[in-house]
Amino acid sequence: MLGGDRRRLELAYSLMFTLPGTPVLRYGDELGMGDDLSLKERTCCRTPMQWSTEPNGGFTKSDKPVVPVISDGPYGYEHVNAAEQRRDPNSMLNWTERIIRMRKEVPEVGWGEFEILKTGDAAVLAIRYDWRNNSVLFLHNFAKDPREFEFSTGIEGKIGDRLVNLLTADHSTAGENGKHCVCLEGYGYRWYRVGGLDYLLKRTEF
């Protein structure tokens, strides 16, 4: 999927987890598993889970599995498997686990109302969710090149002047014009909480 491009995979998953609705991952997506296009019809995307570097990816001891494990190329089980990715803190698997945990910590996405914000760039999507006096804001750059742009959170008062990045330490403070200036790398994304991290104290103020 997406040629195994880690940047685009992260963008796609980040987008899925921050759009309204229920995110769905099929087994192997968390590893970046590929498809075997030599197989017929939907079987090509239903190859066995690649658990380890053991024969048949650790999926079965059978010499003739019903559907063969992907064994060759960049998606072969020796290159893409759960066991090795669990030990690698920078792997796709561990990144996916972190993004799922963070998604569970932003109930605004599931319960709140959303608004699309103006960025002045058709390649950049900015969406804000509001729920129980709290807001989260997500940015996604669909272009392969970096994009620098200004935008307003759309929230009155000083609370909108501060954006706390939920995934890294790359926070943002509004300029004198009340707008935030952000540079997103190609296929980049940001998850922000508006105002600060004291949101749990504000949920009772509604």
Q: For each of these PLM feature ranges, what is it?
A:
Residues 10-13:
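Catalytic and substrate-binding clefts that recognize carbohydrates or anionic sugar/phosphate headgroups
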